[in-house]
Amino acid sequence: VLFVVSEGRFNFVNRIRAWEQKHNHGEKVQGFVLGDPVPLASEELQPFINGACCASPTDEYKLVVLDTVGRSMAGMNENSQQDASAFTSMVERIQRELNTTVLALHHTGHNVTNRARGSSVFGADADTIIRADRQGKDYLVSLTMTKQKDAPEWEKKKFIKLSGVSLDLETKSLVAVKPGEDECPKGDKFHP
């Protein structure tokens, strides 16, 4: 996995350590690479591709995560069809050149929470869209598939729970875990 962190990079190492502690018995996770530099839709992509190839011991990734779309579009306009198309073209090139799947994390708008903020190009060009919604003030998050181009959509919501992991006396991080069936809302049928 190549994870390109452009938002929250300072604390990302703590998130990795917490995940390792919770899901990997405290052992370092293998095959996980932090990407640098952040690919920008407005710049030449080849330095990112070359860096990704050099950083991988096997020259291949099963997944590339871009966190976030907004940061990968620095200096561009998310509402512009032309700029959004430049971003989705960049994603397609990363997919093609690294022979991988790309997960681009994007925020919803402040007033419209049922779709990604910015141009409708993001939704139109995406193969799959999964919306994450925090359920109230607890740490339960529902995952709703709103688009799936080449396979059946999920029939039901899926859920994850954010669990606090203490790394030391002062440092704590949240990690996604599978919730118990009794932790999911009664109106939604649990679907692991």
Predicted regions and their residues:
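Short amphipathic alpha-helical interface segments
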Residues: 184-192
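Short, intrinsically disordered low-complexity segments
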Residues: 14, 70, 116, 130-133, ...
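Phosphate-binding/switch region of NTP-binding enzymes
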Residues: 63, 82-171
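Conserved inter-motif catalytic segment of the P-loop NTP-binding fold
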Residues: 1-77, 82, 86, 93, ...
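Histidine (H) residue identity feature
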Residues: 23-25, 106-110, 191
